[in-house]
Amino acid sequence: MGAAYHFMGKAIPPHQLAIGTLGLLGLLVVPNPFKSAKPKTVDIKTDNKDEEKFIENYLKKHSEKQDA
């Protein structure tokens, strides 16, 4: 057999340690696919109410186009 690490009385081959390490890193690095995403909001600050309405309507209209 080849060289092996002895951990808690058991012989563990190096390739199993490598696979376990890569698997653990993969689980820690990959983001959670089941996590709910918060919808993005835009904070509109204008002095003019007409500008504010125009921007809100523009964003609403173009966000509907992206959804379709």
Curated annotation (Swiss-Prot):
Q: Which GO terms describe its cellular component?
A: mitochondrial inner membrane; mitochondrion; proton-transporting ATP synthase complex
Family matches, as InterPro entries: ATP19 (IPR021278)
Q: Which GO terms describe its biological process?
A: protein-containing complex assembly; proton motive force-driven ATP synthesis; proton transmembrane transport
Q: Name one Pfam family in it.
A: ATP19
- UniProt keywords, alphabetically: ATP synthesis, CF(0), Hydrogen ion transport, Ion transport, Membrane, Mitochondrion, Mitochondrion inner membrane, Transmembrane, Transmembrane helix, Transport
Localized where?
Mitochondrion inner membrane
Q: Which residues cross the membrane?
A: 15-31
The answer to keyword Ubl conjugation applying to this record is no
Q: How does it sit in the membrane?
A: Single-pass membrane protein
Q: Print the miscellaneous field.
A: Present with 1320 molecules/cell in log phase SD medium.
Biological role stated in the UniProt entry? Mitochondrial membrane ATP synthase (F(1)F(0) ATP synthase or Complex V) produces ATP from ADP in the presence of a proton gradient across the membrane which is generated by electron transport complexes of the respiratory chain. F-type ATPases consist of two structural domains, F(1) - containing the extramembraneous catalytic core and F(0) - containing the membrane proton channel, linked together by a central stalk and a peripheral stalk. During catalysis, ATP synthesis in the catalytic domain of F(1) is coupled via a rotary mechanism of the central stalk subunits to proton translocation.
- Assembly mode: F-type ATPases have 2 components, CF(1) - the catalytic core - and CF(0) - the membrane proton channel. In yeast, the dimeric form of ATP synthase consists of 17 polypeptides: alpha, beta, gamma, delta, epsilon, 4 (B), 5 (OSCP), 6 (A), 8, 9 (C), d, E (Tim11), f, g, h, i/j and k.
Q: Which family does it belong to?
A: Belongs to the ATP19 family.
Entry protein name? ATP synthase subunit K, mitochondrial
Give the gene symbol.
ATP19
